[in-house]
A protein has these predicted regions:
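Alpha-helical scaffold elements adjacent to nucleotide-binding pockets in ATP/GTP-utilizing enzyme cores
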Residues: 7-14, 38-41, 168
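Active-site cores that bind ATP or allylic diphosphates and position pyrophosphate for catalysis
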Residues: 1, 9, 27, 44-186, ...
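Single conserved hydrophobic/aromatic residue that forms the stacking wall/gate
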Residues: 216-226
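A charged helix-plus-loop insertion that forms the helical arch/lid used to bind
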Residues: 4
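A glycine-rich helix N-cap at a beta->alpha junction
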Residues: 12-27
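Hydrophobic alpha-helix position signal
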Residues: 15, 42, 173, 207-208
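Short beta->alpha linker loops
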Residues: 30-33
Length: 226
């Protein structure tokens, strides 16, 4: 629901302002169909299931870093039932929040991100590119590595807070990778912090939305330091 064409346009404007261009535009939404088909593959291999619990119930069962989580009561649904329910989600026959699709990994993993993460949810929202073609949307971790693989990216560079995600990134790739193609690798680095300024997108958005500062545009000035 946070997707908006203005953010896409702002990125393009910033790249142009820096004096660069690009050969090809790529969007994760271009891969929605492939991601959906891979999700059906996971279900068919009994590696994903439709969970009908509320988000609060799912969170309560996740456990803690020191305590294992608990299996969902829907974890052992049959492949046939999961396939039917997931197709109903895609066809818009399910209200938001009623079902989610989760990967079936390990609820006792010391890495809490591996405890049956949600990979699809229902959302009745118009997407800036796909419009209303899709009512199910893939979660970040499912989209990340798979998009890198589709684009044949060799290395995905992330800041250090994504280090715990690497195990999940690799698990998802294990399910779809072809040995004849490039297998992406996630690598992390320390984020650059600048003194006496703010670079956090969340904090900058707060400042702009509350009229504490103005949104800079290339029409306003040519020097961002001015």
């Amino acid at each position: 629901e946070n997707e908006d064409q203005k953010y896409i346009d702002a990125i393009k404007s910033d790249v142009n302002w820096l004096g660069y261009s690009w050969d090809e535009e790529r969007y994760a939404s271009d891969y929605f169909q492939q991601l959906y088909e891979w999700s059906l593959k996971l279900i068919n291999e009994d590696k994903a299931y439709v969970d009908s619990q509320t988000s609060e119930e799912i969170a309560d069962q996740k456990g803690t870093p020191k305590e294992p989580g608990k299996n969902s009561p829907f974890r052992n649904r049959t492949i046939e039932e999961n396939t039917t329910l997931f197709r109903q989600m895609k066809e818009g026959k399910v209200e938001p929040g009623k079902h989610v699709l989760r990967a079936k990994i390990d609820m006792s993993s010391p890495n809490m991100l591996m405890r049956d993460p949600v990979i699809y949810r229902v959302l009745n929202a118009s997407h800036p590119r796909t419009k209303n073609d899709w009512v199910i949307f893939p979660m970040y971790d499912w989209t990340h590595g798979e998009s890198d693989y589709i684009e044949q990216i060799s290395h995905s560079l992330c800041t250090l807070e994504f280090k715990p995600h690497r195990e999940l990134y690799d698990w998802f790739l294990d399910q779809v990778v072809d040995e004849d193609k490039i297998r992406p690798k996630q690598r992390e680095f320390a984020r650059l912090n600048l003194s006496h300024t703010i670079t956090s997108k969340r904090k900058l958005l707060f400042l702009v939305e509350n009229n504490i500062c103005l949104l800079y545009t290339s029409d306003a000035a040519d020097d961002p330091a001015s």
